């Protein structure tokens, strides 16, 4: 029987060195080509962990990167598949992020911002000429070729990039990073190349004053701002910016994508192509200071999101004696730090749009511990990125949240709240019913009236690894392990475990639990 020879071209041709970065399924390491001693950055993807769809995305990224050869784009030099791993060999860019470099400069002017956006537009124009849309233009993906003064800006990370048909618009899914998403993507309209120009407009705005045009702690409010194109040029920081710079921003942040300036047109704008005579040369110290805070906030937000993937905590009415886990404490402390940083008046223009929502350090009454399977990947590589499955992820989070609310109602002995979340004809299989199918609320009402409502002892519930299956627009199923900690009648701590499945149906915009299946120990702790 013939055997297929395993490819070892990467292992044979390249020597690996230190790690440069890490993601959910990939790691980036410095490597050297043995024959030339040339240094590169190798993105190593563990293909054993990839789904069929992930494989398609990987192939698409490699195909797109092979097409693009431009001095302002991180170039792909090689793409090699070996047993269990795929290697993408890129330029080794050593200058770090553009935004981090700016804050280290002694002098930074509007003309410098013009030079930066010029290079970014050159890269965007190149990819658009090849019918590629990046979809994730943001500061994290704008790198410098080296640490030398005047090093080229390079556009990186084509993981969300797509191939389009010329100027044709279509719905390619919800992808990007919240503050840089265009109105048409948020409206779920067909879209194309103009989404990259919108993101360039956001980046240019930040380059000039150090804070973003759209901001709110509440993502829904942020999206409303973007869809309305609700940005302005507040005094005093914008008073020293030339009208030509504001004009270019206005043309980039045009709500109607058909009327938005193109990359080619933007490169011909006087503020870009005649910067020496049009752009101001005045040093912008306040911009540098605001940008420093903006950078700190970006990094902190990434750390918080990564921490919160480990453990999310939700508050219920009763006080619990159960201590917060280390991950929960870290998430809470990070949340407090974020709140402090975000609400400071001096924080890079956020003063203009303070959110009424806030981050609280919560008592751990109902804890949800996710694994990395439900569209929530523990990736520091994309923790600030909305994935292509964002729509699905949001709906899954909605189901997890309503399940938490239902369990909180049970823990609180609140039958009224319970009935508002459950269908009157709720069917259930559960240990308390001795394997019989129960229909309606009366069976559960007995426990609420005679056990749960009389229970004054602390209860702490942990939902482990919730798996959500979305079934069409208005139905979903969630399966999880539920651990319930409680104090028994003798004052001793106890834990019960049950494996639960709930089927949810949305009617008139409201989710109702229509079926419940529980195995293991009774969910209601016996006193």
Swiss-Prot record:
CDD domains: STKc_CaMKII
GO biological process: calcium ion transport; cell differentiation; G1/S transition of mitotic cell cycle; nervous system development; regulation of long-term neuronal synaptic plasticity; regulation of neuron projection development; regulation of neuronal synaptic plasticity; regulation of postsynaptic membrane neurotransmitter receptor levels
Subcellular location: Sarcoplasmic reticulum membrane
SUPFAM superfamilies per record: NTF2-like (SSF54427), Protein kinase-like (PK-like) (SSF56112)
Residue span of region Calmodulin-binding: 294-316
Disulfide bonds: none
Reaction catalysed by this enzyme: L-seryl-[protein] + ATP = O-phospho-L-seryl-[protein] + ADP + H(+); L-threonyl-[protein] + ATP = O-phospho-L-threonyl-[protein] + ADP + H(+)
Modified residues (Phosphothreonine): 287, 306-307
GO cellular component, one term: neuron projection
Location (main, coarse): membrane
PROSITE patterns, per the entry: PROTEIN_KINASE_ATP, PROTEIN_KINASE_DOM, PROTEIN_KINASE_ST
Gene3D superfamilies: 3.10.450.50, 6.10.140.620, Phosphorylase Kinase, domain 1 (3.30.200.20), Transferase(Phosphotransferase) domain 1 (1.10.510.10)
Keyword Phosphoprotein: yes
Record region (Autoinhibitory domain): 283-292
Recorded superkingdom: Eukaryota
InterPro entries: Ca/CaM-dep_prot_kinase-assoc, Kinase-like_dom_sf, NTF2-like_dom_sf, Prot_kinase_dom, Protein_kinase_ATP_BS, Ser/Thr_kinase_AS
Keyword vocabulary terms for this entry: ATP-binding, Calmodulin-binding, Developmental protein, Differentiation, Kinase, Membrane, Neurogenesis, Nucleotide-binding, Phosphoprotein, Sarcoplasmic reticulum, Serine/threonine-protein kinase, Transferase
Lipid bilayer topology: Peripheral membrane protein
Annotated Protein kinase domain residues: 14-272
Residue list for modification Phosphoserine: 311, 321, 325, 329, 355, 453
Binding residue positions for ATP: 20-28, 43
Domain comment (free text): The CAMK2 protein kinases contain a unique C-terminal subunit association domain responsible for oligomerization.
Oligomeric form and interacting partners: CAMK2 is composed of 4 different chains: alpha (CAMK2A), beta (CAMK2B), gamma (CAMK2G), and delta (CAMK2D). The different isoforms assemble into homo- or heteromultimeric holoenzymes composed of 12 subunits with two hexameric rings stacked one on top of the other.
Assigned protein family: Belongs to the protein kinase superfamily. CAMK Ser/Thr protein kinase family. CaMK subfamily.
Protein name: Calcium/calmodulin-dependent protein kinase type II subunit gamma
UniProt organism field: Rattus norvegicus
Taxonomic classification: Eukaryota, Metazoa, Chordata, Craniata, Vertebrata
């Amino acid at each position: 029987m013939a055997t297929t020879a395993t490819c070892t071209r990467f292992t044979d041709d390249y020597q690996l060195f230190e790690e440069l970065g890490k993601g959910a399924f990939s790691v980036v390491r410095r490597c050297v080509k043995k024959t030339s001693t040339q240094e590169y950055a190798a993105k190593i993807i563990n293909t054993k962990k990839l789904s069929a769809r992930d494989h398609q995305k990987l192939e698409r990224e490699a195909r797109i990167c092979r097409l693009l050869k431009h001095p302002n784009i991180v170039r792909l030099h090689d793409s090699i598949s070996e047993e269990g791993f795929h290697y993408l060999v890129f330029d080794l860019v050593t200058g770090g992020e553009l935004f981090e470099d700016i804050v280290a400069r002694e002098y930074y002017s509007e003309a410098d911002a013009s030079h930066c956006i010029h290079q970014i537009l050159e890269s965007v124009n190149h990819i658009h000429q090849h019918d590629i849309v990046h979809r994730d233009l943001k500061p994290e993906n704008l790198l410098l070729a080296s640490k030398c003064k005047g090093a080229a800006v390079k556009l990186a990370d084509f993981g969300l990039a797509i191939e389009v048909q010329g100027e044709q618009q279509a719905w390619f899914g919800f992808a990007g990073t919240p503050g840089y998403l265009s109105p048409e993507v948020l409206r779920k309209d067909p879209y194309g190349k103009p989404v990259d120009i919108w993101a360039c407009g956001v980046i240019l705005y930040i380059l000039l004053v150090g804070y973003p045009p759209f901001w709110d702690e509440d993502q829904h409010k942020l999206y409303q701002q973007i869809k309305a194109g609700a940005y302005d040029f507040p005094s005093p920081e914008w008073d020293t910016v030339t009208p030509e710079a504001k004009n270019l921003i206005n043309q980039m942040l045009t709500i109607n994508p058909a009327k938005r300036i193109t990359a080619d047109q933007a490169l011909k704008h006087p503020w870009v192509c005649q910067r020496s005579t049009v752009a101001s040369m005045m040093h912008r110290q306040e911009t540098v200071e605001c940008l420093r805070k903006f950078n700190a906030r970006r990094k902190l937000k990434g750390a918080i999101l990564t921490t919160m993937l480990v453990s999310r905590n939700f508050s219920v009415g009763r006080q619990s004696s159960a201590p917060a886990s280390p991950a929960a404490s870290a998430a809470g402390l990070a949340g407090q730090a974020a709140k402090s940083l975000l609400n400071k008046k001096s924080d890079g223009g956020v003063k203009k749009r303070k959110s009424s929502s806030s981050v609280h350090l919560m008592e751990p009454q109902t804890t949800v511990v996710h694994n990395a399977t439900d569209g929530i990947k523990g990736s520091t590589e994309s923790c600030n990125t909305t994935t292509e499955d964002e729509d699905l992820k949001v709906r899954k989070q909605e189901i997890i949240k309503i399940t938490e609310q239902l369990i909180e109602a049970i823990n609180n002995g609140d039958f009224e709240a319970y009935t508002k979340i459950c269908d009157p004809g709720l069917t259930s299989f559960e240990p308390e019913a001795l394997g019989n199918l129960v229909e309606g609320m009366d069976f559960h009402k007995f426990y609420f009236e005679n056990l749960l409502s009389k229970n004054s002892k602390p209860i702490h519930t942990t939902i482990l690894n919730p798996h959500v299956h979305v079934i069409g627009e208005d139905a979903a199923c969630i399966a999880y392990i539920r651990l319930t900690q409680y104090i028994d009648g003798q004052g001793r701590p106890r834990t019960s475990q049950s494996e639960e499945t709930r089927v949810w149906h949305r009617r008139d915009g409201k989710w109702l639990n229509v079926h419940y299946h529980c195995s293991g120990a009774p969910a209601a702790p016996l006193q």
